[in-house]
């Protein structure tokens, strides 16, 4: 199956960098969306601490629901160690509001990557999947 990510020169890639993350496509020259095959992502990011997912899942999305989509997802370190960063667009107007509130997105990411920096932050767009 296909895997959708953002290029290394994208707005979100810059926010990852600003939040102290080492994005697996940081050297990619594209500024928009990138479509990759599973094997490419697995080879480059299977040991990543975090994995960002944005979808419109009906109901409550979970690790089990993700594994049902593709059992290979459970092989990723971010899956095994509960490092999935999640936004459900059914509950959050991600694409409508996020571009105008980069400081909130950055705070969400900082809260996830470095919880000691913003311990009282209430996530708006991204939170850790439960």
What is each residue range found by the language model?
Residues 1-100, 130:
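Binding-cleft/active-site segments that stabilize strongly anionic ligands or cofactors
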Residues 87-90, 112-116:
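Hydrophobic alpha-helical segments
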Residues 95-108, 112-113:
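Flexible loop/turn connectors
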Residues 114-130:
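Extracellular/periplasmic juxtamembrane helices and adjacent flexible linkers that interface
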């Amino acid at each position: 199956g296909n895997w959708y990510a953002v290029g290394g020169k994208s707005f979100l890639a810059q926010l990852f960098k600003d939040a102290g993350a080492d994005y697996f496509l940081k050297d990619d020259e594209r500024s928009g969306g990138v479509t990759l095959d599973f094997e490419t992502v697995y080879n480059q990011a299977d040991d990543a601490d975090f994995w960002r997912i944005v979808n419109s899942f009906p109901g409550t999305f979970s690790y089990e629901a993700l594994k049902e989509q593709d059992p290979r997802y459970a092989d990723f370190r971010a899956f095994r160690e509960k490092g999935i960063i999640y936004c459900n667009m059914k509950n959050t107007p991600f694409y409508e509001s996020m571009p105008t509130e980069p400081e909130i997105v950055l705070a969400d990411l900082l809260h996830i990557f470095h919880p000691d920096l913003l311990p009282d932050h209430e996530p708006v767009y991204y939170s850790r999947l439960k």
